[in-house]
């Protein structure tokens, strides 16, 4: 029986053949998807592909709400803010 942390389906199972001829199961975290805008669902532009390996300062664009909202949502919000 695998340990409790490995029973979850959020962990990927890979069958590996050992030099001794046995087949064992290795567990690894599933790859995360591209970060998406919560409003439009578009992928956020300017984000590094290796998102979770780097800190937020390195991977996110330097614009306001960079790394959170897509450029279309930001442009719309800025236009509304200027008009008020």
Swiss-Prot record:
- Which Gene Ontology terms describe the biological processes this protein takes part in? translation
What GO cellular component is one of the record's annotations? ribonucleoprotein complex
The portions of this protein that span the membrane are: none
Q: Which GO-annotated molecular functions does the record name?
A: structural constituent of ribosome
Protein keywords: Ribonucleoprotein, Ribosomal protein
Which Pfam families does this entry report, sorted A to Z? Ribosomal_L34e (PF01199)
NCBIfam families, per the entry: PRK04059.1
Protein family: Belongs to the eukaryotic ribosomal protein eL34 family.
Protein name as annotated: Large ribosomal subunit protein eL34
- Name the encoding gene, please: ribL34e
